[in-house]
Structures are given as structure tokens and as C-alpha cells.
């Protein structure tokens, strides 16, 4: 036992950080040791835990009751098999089998298995009942294919007439074999380059054509409002939700911005409660966080959220200790533990906000459409202040509805799922949508990265519809704040979409979802195709300027084959391509003119914003092209692309990072400009949008990431969106709660979980590694605690921190040793962290009584 004279000082400090009445603080201050203090705090309830040599663990419940008395009223305390207190942060587990079907991606293997009598996976027992919308959808997609092919054929024919070398038919292969290699190269090279240009042009034009017709039909849908196949029209929107139609709203997170995540979740919870349908919904925060400081911040944020919304027993938290299969594995784990308790599941992202009306409407739509497996909303982007993000918000808000409505027009009930802000029918998802790793080795094998498209394809293969409710309000998300953060996300999406293409020929996939896999690939593969198209165009210019033209391509040819140039055809084709690219944007703005532009700043402001956004999109397109080309090559070649961006409070891109990321692009733009100027300066007029963008990439990336410019644009009503003009209640609440959460955001989470009396009690009660007593476990615990004591909080590695955080016994023993031994490396660092935090509670803490607003209700310093 410690000497009382050496214990009093830290003992008084410890008690000062507990919200006690003054008389109780004096009584506990008479304790001769920390063990006695915890025994007095625990009373008879903690005897079992204390008998095991864990005095701090014995007082966990008492300390939590002091800080959060609402826990008792909500019956949140439980006792495990060893008599240790825990919080009921998740419902009782009722396990459901989640078994992924192995992928058979090789059609030759499938054919061999059929020949040898071994069965391939059977077709699903359930078939989607044949409905009129399926016939209509098939007819529409056939028409779309004809339109794309016809448009591409005409454009390719024009392109062929524009290219200078028209004598390929006169090339005699037999003669080529008899002449020198140099003569053959000089004669054939221009035609080979032209063929490559023509092939790439046809592919790229077809891709642009698909987007054009999608936007055009979306414009028609939104203009007329006569979509008889709208999924949102199948429910009146006010019918009561059945008592057994329970819905889990799940939010998978991983090392996220905790104040923003829980602010958005609180706004969603409160909006849901306002509908009067809260009894049908439960909320789950599914954490894959592996940063100990963030994990502790999540625990405290969960407790505060439950207390502020009276959500104990309705809002749950689970942090995985074994992170497998990333987000899809996180969802699988939820389905395996609790999926059988719910009929539906709504998946939200960390930056998602959804209104209660939207959530209730989704459930009603599912109830009204028993053949629907997934209903995807069209989230509206909002909430960002940088110039880049505001331009992207404006673009997605103005142009996005056309493309989303167009997707619905062509796909109907065989549509997309984007992985968040969507409702899923739980049982078929569990039965059919678990994802096995892709077989083989290399960068395109292993756990599937972009799970959403694959899950939609599996849901449709199982006989369930996948719909987009493109006109459903109340669904929101946030966009990356700057170009480099967007590209960081694109790198992951690029690899995931390329992996998904391995499933293109998997048995049973619907043709629409095979097309979805193809379009997912083209979203990124179009970048290297465009880059190679530009490279070949430059190469053709070099051949035309540097090589002596071959006018006579066969013996006894009477008339020369002159290189041709038709500027009128080139201008016509160029104008047509620009029309396909930019007409959808103009149609979007025309639709706003027709329906009212007040929410976008008025007719003049929305038009000016469109023109500015078009200018910036032209500037940024070549930059994205080079990055996406790099991502595609890295995926195919198995390169590991490291991208560790620094943390930035204002989301601005530093000049140093912009130079590092865009420097090679700038040099390429300068070199390309000099080369073309040397070959033929007149060609620079055609290439200037490309090389000019690359040369300016550094300042454009930096300047567009500035918050001040974004706020100034908002003040001028540029890039204004309706969610800013008349902000929905949920978004206003999210901003308010984010500000409040940042004001008292928890820093140095693990340090405080190990030292602070209240946070240690919370972390111990939420620890999930609840082992039985065993000598091997005790040995490992002792090693971890000894390592933590020896190294101190700053030198302790992350893996040991996580292990201690998950083990309530080890964490409580570390807490006890730090205070009993008066460890200055821990206590001194903790006191400094408290002193450096201007929003930390003053000590001594006043006693908390039910109804108080905060966890630490003392006056703020």
C-alpha cells in the first residue's frame, strides 16, 4: 500500500476530476490509497471485480453514474460473466449466416465443369416477375444502343475524312515485304497512327454519346414530369409503417472527422424523431477506426449523442477489432450479428445526412414494392466552403439531376447502387450479396474494393429490383474540399472499378449490370485513351512535318496521293463534340430558368455560374486525365501509389503539396507546348486548352482550394444552390452541431482514456475483449501494461494502444498504476493536455444531476 503522505496530492487531483459534491469529495479524500478510494466509490457492487485485483475496474459503474446519471435510468449497465461492468452499447447478438458464393470468373473453367458433370452455381430460385417496365426498359436500352452506334458511326466517318492520309487502300503488303524496313516504316507509319487515332476517337465519341443521350432523356423526364415508372410514385407517403417493418440505419466509419460525423447523425436522429416513427428505426455507428485517439473520441461522442437525443437503446456503437474486407466487411459483420432483427437497412456514409421524412418514405416505398431489393436516393451535395467544392456542389446540383433521371429512364428497376443513402431489403442482401474475394493473385485479386456496383448486380441476379428514387428529397452528402482530395478518392474508385470488370462474364449477371461494370471501367479508362489519342495526334503532326510524304504507293501509279486537309469538316466535327459535351449543362440551366432560378441566385447568377464552372471544368479536365492515366497504369502494373496528404484544418492545398503533385504535369505541358510550337505553331490553337491547363495546374489547384474565395463567391451568389438559399432544417442542425462539437472536441483520446477518471470508466465499460481468466491472457496483459508504463504515452505504438483500449482489465490496471505510482510521463502529459485545451472543463467538477446538459457540466474556462 502506498504511503499516505505521498498519496494525498495525486489523490486530491484525481477527486478534482470527478463530479462530486463537496462533502463526498472530502469523505473520499480520507482514503489511504487509490485502492481504498475505488473501493469506497464502488461500494458493494464492485467487490467481485476488486477481488480480482482490479480496483479501478470495480469503480467503473460508480464513476459513470457520477458523470452520466442517465445511464441508470436507461438501464444501460450490464455485468459480464466475470462480474465486470459493461455498457449495453449494442443489442444482443442473434447470429445469421452470411456466406459469400465463390466467384467463377473464367468461362473456360465453367464450360469444363459443365462438360465434366460438375455443377456450376444454380440459378436463383426466385425470378423477378415479368412486368411491363422490364419490356419497356429493354426497348429503351436497345434504342439507346442504336442512337449511340449511329451517332458514333457518322462522327467516325467524318473523322476519317478529316485525317490527311487517305491512301491506305493503295498500300501493297506484298511490295512492303520486298522493300527495306526504313522505306516500309516511312510508307506505313502515318496510316498506322491514323488507324489508332480513328479507333480511339470512335471509342471516346461513343462514351460521350452515351452521356449525351442519358442527359437528354433526363431533361425530358424532368421537364414533362410524366414518368409513369417512378418508384417514388408508388407510395402515398403518409401511410403508417407496420410495426414489424423494423429498419436499421447503419453508418460505417473509419478514422473520420468525429465532430462532423456525430453532428450529421444527431441531425438525422432528431429529424427521424420528429416524424413520430422513431420506434421503427435503430441507428448503428459501425466503426473500423484503428487510430486510438479517434476511437476514444468516437466513444465519448456516442455517449454525448445518446444523452442529448435520449437515444440510449436506439443508437448503438460497435468498433471492430478485426478489420477485414473494409467497408463491405463492416456491413457483413453487422448483418451477421444483428441483420436478422431487421427487415430493412439504410446505409449512410460518414458525411451523409438524411431527413426523417426521406427515411420514412424509403421504408414506405419498400413496403409498397415487395419486388424491390434496393432503392437508391440521389444525394444532394452541400456543406462545403472552398471554391473548388462549391463549384462541384453547383455542378452536381444543377447537372446531376439530368443524368440521374436519365439513368433511371434507361435502367428502371435494373439500376445503380452507390453504397450510401439507400435502403436495402435485408434478407436477400444477406442471402445473396455477401462478397467473396476475387480469385488469383495480383492487384486485381483479393477483397473487392468498390462493393456497391457488385452488390446491386447480385441483388438483381437474385431476382430483386434495384431502383433510383431520383426525385426524393431529404438526402444529402458532402464532396471533397479540393482537387487533390478528390483525386485521392478517385484512386481507390479507379482500382475498384477495374477489379469489378473481372465479374463482367460471371454467370447470371443481368446485361444492364454488365454494362454498369463496363461504364465503371470507362469512367477511368477513358482518361488514358484520351491521353493516347492526343499523343498519337501529336505523333501524326510530327510525321507530317518531319517525314517526306509518299505520294506514289504502288508501281505504275499515274496520279499522286496528296495529303488532305478539310478545315470545314474539322470545325463541324469539333463543334458537334462540344455540343455533346456542353449541351447537357445548358439544358440543365434552361430547366432551372423554366422552374425558377431564385434558389440558384437568379437567372443571371446561375447562367454566369454555369459559364465559370464550364471554364474551370475545361481547366481541370486535362489534369484529371493525367492523374487517372497514372492510376490506371498503376493498377495494371501493380504499382503501389502512395498518397499521404497532410491534415489541413481549412482544407486548403499548400503550395508545396501542389508542386509535388502537379510539378511533372507542368513540365509535361511546357515540353509539349515547345514541341508542337517547333513542329507547327498553328496546331497550338487546337492543343492550347490541354497544354495550358497542365501549365496552370499548380496555381489552379491551390487557388481553387481556398475557403475565402468560396465564401466570397457565395456572397456574390455565384455557385449558389437551393440548400444554401433556403437551408433545410437537417443541414442547419448539422452545421450547428458540428460547430458545437468542434468547440469541445476530444484531443489526445487514448492518453485521457488511460488517465482521466471519467473517460477511463467509459473506455473500460465499452471495451469488448472480455476474456475469461487465464494465465496466458494475464501474461500478455502484464507485458502490455509494462510496455505502456516504460515507454510512456508518446512512445507507445498504435497496436498496443488499441489492444489496451479494447481490454477493460488491462486499461483499468494501467489507470491504477499511472495514479498509484504518480507517473509523471503520463500525468504530466495529461495535465498539459488539459491546460492547453481552452475548452476543457474547470476543476474541481461540480456534481452532475439528471437533466444537466453536459458530461462535464462545470463552467468553461
From Swiss-Prot:
UniProt key word Transmembrane: yes
Cell compartments where the protein resides: Cell inner membrane
Enzyme kind, highest EC tier: transferase
Protein's membrane topology: Multi-pass membrane protein
Pathway note: Glycan metabolism; osmoregulated periplasmic glucan (OPG) biosynthesis
Task of the protein: Involved in the biosynthesis of osmoregulated periplasmic glucans (OPGs).
Chief place where the protein resides: membrane
UniProt KW Cell membrane keyword: yes
Lineage: Bacteria, Pseudomonadati, Pseudomonadota, Gammaproteobacteria, Pseudomonadales
Gene Ontology CC entries for this record: plasma membrane
GO MF annotation list: hexosyltransferase activity
Pfam families cross-referenced by the UniProt entry: Glycos_transf_2
GN (gene name): opgH
Family label: Belongs to the glycosyltransferase 2 family. OpgH subfamily.
Domain of life assignment: Bacteria
Entry's EC annotation: 2.4.1.-
GO biological process, any: glucan biosynthetic process
Xref: InterPro entries: Glucans_biosynth_gluTrFase_H, Glyco_trans_2-like, Glycosyltr_2/OpgH_subfam, Nucleotide-diphossugar_trans
Transmembrane segments: 142-159, 198-220, 521-543, 572-594, 601-623, 683-705
Protein name, UniProt field: Glucans biosynthesis glucosyltransferase H
NCBIfam families: PRK05454.1-1 (NF003955), PRK05454.2-1 (NF003958), PRK05454.2-5 (NF003962)
Keywords: Cell inner membrane, Cell membrane, Glycosyltransferase, Membrane, Transferase, Transmembrane, Transmembrane helix
Amino acid at each position: 500500500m502506498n504511503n499516505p503522505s505521498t498519496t494525498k496530492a495525486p489523490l486530491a487531483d484525481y477527486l478534482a476530476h470527478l463530479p462530486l459534491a463537496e462533502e463526498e469529495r472530502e469523505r473520499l479524500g480520507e482514503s489511504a490509497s487509490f485502492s481504498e478510494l475505488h473501493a469506497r466509490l464502488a461500494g458493494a457492487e464492485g467487490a467481485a471485480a476488486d477481488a480480482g485485483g482490479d480496483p479501478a475496474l470495480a469503480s467503473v459503474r460508480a464513476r459513470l453514474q457520477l458523470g452520466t446519471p442517465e445511464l441508470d435510468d436507461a438501464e444501460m449497465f450490464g455485468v459480464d460473466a466475470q462480474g465486470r461492468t459493461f455498457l449495453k452499447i449494442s443489442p444482443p447478438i442473434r447470429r445469421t449466416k452470411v456466406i459469400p458464393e465463390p466467384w467463377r470468373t473464367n468461362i473456360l473453367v465453367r464450360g469444363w465443369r459443365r462438360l465434366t458433370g460438375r455443377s456450376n452455381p444454380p440459378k436463383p430460385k426466385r425470378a423477378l416477375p415479368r412486368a411491363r417496365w422490364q419490356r419497356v426498359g429493354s426497348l429503351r436500352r436497345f434504342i439507346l444502343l442504336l442512337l449511340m452506334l449511329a451517332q458514333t458511326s457518322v462522327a467516325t466517318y467524318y473523322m476519317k475524312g478529316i485525317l490527311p492520309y487517305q491512301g491506305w487502300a493503295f498500300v501493297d503488303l506484298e511490295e512492303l515485304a520486298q522493300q527495306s524496313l526504313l522505306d516500309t516504316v516511312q510508307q506505313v507509319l502515318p496510316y498506322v497512327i491514323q488507324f489508332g487515332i480513328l479507333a480511339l476517337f470512335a471509342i471516346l465519341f461513343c462514351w460521350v454519346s452515351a452521356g449525351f443521350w442519358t442527359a437528354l432523356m433526363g431533361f425530358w423526364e424532368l421537364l414533362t414530369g410524366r414518368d409513369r415508372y417512378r418508384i417514388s410514385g408508388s407510395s402515398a407517403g403518409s401511410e403508417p409503417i407496420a410495426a414489424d417493418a423494423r429498419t436499421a440505419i447503419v453508418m460505417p466509419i473509419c478514422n473520420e472527422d468525429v465532430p462532423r460525423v456525430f453532428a450529421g447523425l444527431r441531425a438525422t436522429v432528431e429529424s427521424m424523431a420528429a416524424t413520430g416513427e422513431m420506434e421503427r428505426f435503430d441507428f448503428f455507428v459501425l466503426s473500423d477506426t484503428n487510430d486510438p485517439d479517434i476511437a476514444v473520441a468516437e466513444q465519448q461522442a456516442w455517449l454525448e449523442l445518446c444523452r442529448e437525443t435520449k437515444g440510449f437503446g436506439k443508437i448503438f456503437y460497435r468498433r471492430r477489432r478485426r478489420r477485414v474486407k473494409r467497408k463491405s466487411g463492416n456491413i457483413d459483420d453487422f448483418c451477421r450479428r444483428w441483420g436478422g432483427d431487421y427487415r430493412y437497412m439504410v446505409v449512410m456514409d460518414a458525411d451523409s445526412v438524411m431527413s426523417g421524412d426521406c427515411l420514412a418514405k424509403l421504408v414506405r416505398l419498400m413496403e409498397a414494392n415487395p419486388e424491390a431489393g434496393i432503392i437508391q436516393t440521389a444525394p444532394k451535395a452541400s456543406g462545403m466552403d472552398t471554391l473548388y467544392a462549391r463549384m462541384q456542389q453547383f455542378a452536381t446540383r444543377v447537372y446531376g439531376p439530368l443524368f440521374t433521371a436519365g439513368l433511371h429512364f434507361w435502367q428502371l428497376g435494373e439500376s445503380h447502387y452507390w453504397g450510401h443513402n439507400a435502403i436495402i431489403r435485408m434478407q436477400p442482401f444477406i442471402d445473396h450479396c455477401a462478397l467473396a474475394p476475387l480469385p488469383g493473385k495480383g492487384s486485381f485479386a483479393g477483397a473487392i474494393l468498390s462493393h456497391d456496383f457488385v452488390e446491386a448486380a447480385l441483388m438483381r441476379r437474385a431476382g430483386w429490383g434495384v431502383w433510383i428514387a431520383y426525385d426524393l428529397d431529404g438526402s444529402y452528402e458532402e464532396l471533397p474540399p479540393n482537387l487533390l482530395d478528390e483525386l485521392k478518392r478517385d484512386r481507390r474508385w479507379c482500382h475498384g472499378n477495374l477489379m469489378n470488370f473481372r465479374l463482367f462474364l460471371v454467370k447470371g449477371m443481368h446485361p444492364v449490370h454488365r454494362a454498369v461494370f463496363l461504364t465503371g471501367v470507362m469512367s477511368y479508362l477513358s482518361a488514358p485513351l484520351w491521353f493516347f489519342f492526343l499523343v498519337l495526334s501529336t505523333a501524326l503532326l510530327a510525321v507530317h512535318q518531319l517525314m517526306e510524304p509518299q505520294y506514289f504507293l504502288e508501281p505504275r501509279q499515274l496520279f499522286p496521293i496528296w495529303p488532305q486537309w478539310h478545315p470545314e469538316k474539322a470545325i463541324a466535327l469539333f463543334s458537334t463534340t462540344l455540343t455533346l459535351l456542353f449541351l447537357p449543362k445548358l439544358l440543365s440551366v434552361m430547366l432551372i430558368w423554366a422552374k425558377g432560378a431564385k434558389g440558384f441566385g437568379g437567372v443571371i447568377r446561375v447562367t454566369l455560374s454555369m459559364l465559370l464552372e464550364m471554364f474551370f471544368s475545361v481547366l481541370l479536365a486535362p489534369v484529371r486525365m493525367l492523374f487517372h492515366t497514372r492510376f490506371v497504369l498503376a493498377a495494371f502494373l501493380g504499382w503501389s501509389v502512395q498518397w499521404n496528404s497532410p491534415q489541413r484544418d481549412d482544407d486548403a492545398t499548400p503550395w508545396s503539396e501542389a508542386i509535388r503533385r502537379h510539378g511533372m504535369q507542368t513540365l509535361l505541358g511546357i515540353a509539349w507546348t515547345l514541341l508542337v510550337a517547333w513542329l507547327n505553331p498553328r496546331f497550338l490553337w487546337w492543343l492550347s486548352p490541354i497544354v495550358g491547363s497542365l501549365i496552370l495546374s499548380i496555381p489552379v489547384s491551390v487557388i481553387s482550394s481556398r475557403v475565402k474565395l468560396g465564401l466570397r463567391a457565395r456572397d456574390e451568389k455565384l455557385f449558389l444552390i437551393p440548400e444554401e438559399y433556403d437551408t433545410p432544417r437537417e443541414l442547419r442542425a448539422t452545421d450547428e452541431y458540428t460547430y458545437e462539437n468542434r468547440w469541445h472536441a476530444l484531443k489526445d483520446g487514448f492518453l485521457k482514456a488511460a488517465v482521466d477518471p471519467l473517460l477511463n470508466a467509459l473506455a473500460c465499460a465499452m471495451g469488448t475483449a472480455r476474456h475469461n481468466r487465464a494465465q496466458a491472457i494475464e501474461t500478455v496483459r502484464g507485458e502490455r501494461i509494462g510496455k505502456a508504463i516504460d515507454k510512456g504515452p508518446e512512445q507507445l505504438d498504435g497496436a498496443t494502444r488499441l489492444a489496451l483500449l479494447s481490454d477493460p482489465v488491462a486499461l483499468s490496471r494501467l489507470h491504477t498504476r499511472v495514479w498509484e505510482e504518480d507517473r509523471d510521463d503520463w500525468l504530466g502529459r495529461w495535465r498539459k493536455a488539459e491546460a492547453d485545451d481552452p475548452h476543457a472543463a474547470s476543476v474541481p467538477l461540480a456534481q452532475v444531476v439528471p437533466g444537466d446538459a453536459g458530461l462535464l457540466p462545470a463552467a468553461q474556462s
